[in-house]
Amino acid sequence: MAILFITEYAEEQIGPAGRVGQMGLEPPIAEQIVTFTSSSQSSAFNSKTRFVRLHTDTNCFLVFGTNPTAVTNTSGRLAQNQTEYRGVPLNASFKVAVTT
């Protein structure tokens, strides 16, 4: 069974002189694991989530929304062992759907 790892972040790291780093401020506010073969949805993201880190162990297709359904070859694609960051709207009850 394929796995999508989701890490939710509310803030980015702020470095010296107020410079924003391109990494999430640890600890994350939530983490999810979604197992899938056909289209499967995550739970709704935390209301404070601003961006998510996605990592998959297999080639997959994904889409975001309040009630998303991922479709092979038409939704966004992640390659096996790829890690990706995506911004999401605050307080939108967004989820990610994923399929092989």
Please state what every model-predicted region is:
Residues 4-6, 34, 54, 62, ...:
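Hydrophobic beta-strand residues in large extracellular and virion-surface proteins
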Residues 18-48:
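Surface-exposed ligand/attachment interfaces on beta-rich extracellular proteins
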Residues 49-52, 87-100:
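Noncatalytic modules at the cell exterior or secretory-pathway interfaces
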